[in-house]
Amino acid sequence: MSETELRKRQAQFTRELHGDDIGKKTGLSALMSKNNSAQKEAVQKYLRNWDGRTDKDAEERRLEDYNEATHSYYNVVTDFYEYGWGSSFHFSRFYKGESFAASIARHEHYLAYKAGIQRGDLVLDVGCGVGGPAREIARFTGCNVIGLNNNDYQIAKAKYYAKKYNLSDQMDFVKGDFMKMDFEENTFDKVYAIEATCHAPKLEGVYSEIYKVLKPGGTFAVYEWVMTDKYDENNPEHRKIAYEIELGDGIPKMFHVDVARKALKNCGFEVLVSEDLADNDDEIPWYYPLTGEWKYVQNLANLATFFRTSYLGRQFTTAMVTVMEKLGLAPEGSKEVTAALENAAVGLVAGGKSKLFTPMMLFVARKPENAETPSQTSQEATQ
């Protein structure tokens, strides 16, 4: 199937699943308004790639089907993410007394600062979700943002929110595959990605595309999901944690940190910063919202978010969604989605506590001033 045909089919399926009025409803209300048969199909499309197998053949199948797997994943989980987490789908560090919303915004501000984003810059957000980070970074810096996403539902929601918050003049969101970007070479002043390029079947492929569209002298900053130096691919317990993260987060394969670092260098980037922000002695761990440990709750404003994302809250949501599904209020397959997300939470907490996994490996890389875009190399890397 050609890229054009795939995009048309995905757009048509999104309309069947979500309807035409996307944006006004969020969370569980959006879930309840989905087309039942289309939701069932979306869940089946996603789960067929995760059948409990962790062998090389199963891994290769997921890597080959990354585009459809990622599109299907966000069709089924976006409403749950907004319900439990908000419009910025990423983790962050927490400081004593800091609210959840403040920590999320600070994490985004820090990336923008490290990337050197300035007022008037044209910036690419790779894997933009529903536009939460793009809106925050645009407000924080005064830059102009283009958000790239392969999920039609999220693009429609991102555009709706940009209009709602009077930011449409500062940003736009486009459909595309980050392994085959449609932008002209040397287009963007800066590029960033927040916990998104982990969906790539090959990091060198997406990084080479970013290198291609970034102007010479421009900066790319990313929070990457990787397995750390403590991870052993041959350790069954380690592999189980990685698989739980892959299953629940729509990731074809979790790569080791060295793979990411080498991929950046192989694409021609000068790596300026390589730092695991999760490797610290913070009193409050980055994964605390998933743990169910109430001692970490900072203030009353955090209680609602923490309850929804904690173990107890997730069990409550699963039970509620199961009842709603039986009553016909939620589309069939919804409870399977909550089960997959529960697997992800278990894996993320286990990976965080053991420091086998980090969701915030910060890389800041620069495209040399005298760089000539290696178009042929870029094409080879995506294959």
Swiss-Prot record:
Record PTM Phosphoserine, positions in chain: S99
Keywords carried by this UniProt record: Acetylation, Endoplasmic reticulum, Lipid biosynthesis, Lipid metabolism, Methyltransferase, Microsome, Mitochondrion, Phosphoprotein, S-adenosyl-L-methionine, Steroid biosynthesis, Steroid metabolism, Sterol biosynthesis, Sterol metabolism, Transferase
InterPro entries in the cross-refs: Erg6_SMT_methyltransf, Methyltransf_11, MeTrfase_SMT, SAM-dependent_MTases_sf, Sterol_MeTrfase_C
GO biological processes: ergosterol biosynthetic process; methylation
Pathway given in the UniProt record: Steroid metabolism; ergosterol biosynthesis; ergosterol from zymosterol: step 1/5
Domain of life, per lineage: Eukaryota
Traits of the deletion mutant: Abolishes the production of ergosterol.
Entry's EC annotation: 2.1.1.41
GO molecular function: identical protein binding; sterol 24-C-methyltransferase activity
Pfam families reported in the protein's UniProt record: Methyltransf_11, Sterol_MT_C
Official protein name in the record: Sterol 24-C-methyltransferase ERG6
Function, in words: Sterol 24-C-methyltransferase; part of the third module of ergosterol biosynthesis pathway that includes the late steps of the pathway. The third module or late pathway involves the ergosterol synthesis itself through consecutive reactions that mainly occur in the endoplasmic reticulum (ER) membrane. Firstly, the squalene synthase ERG9 catalyzes the condensation of 2 farnesyl pyrophosphate moieties to form squalene, which is the precursor of all steroids.
Gene name as annotated: ERG6
Family: Belongs to the class I-like SAM-binding methyltransferase superfamily. Erg6/SMT family.
Modified residues (N-acetylserine): S2
GO cellular component, one term: mitochondrial outer membrane
UniProt source species: Saccharomyces cerevisiae (strain ATCC 204508 / S288c) (Baker's yeast)
Reactions listed under catalytic activity: zymosterol + S-adenosyl-L-methionine = fecosterol + S-adenosyl-L-homocysteine + H(+)
Anything else known: Present with 53800 molecules/cell in log phase SD medium.
Oligomeric form and interacting partners: Interacts with ERG28.
Compartment(s): Microsome; Mitochondrion
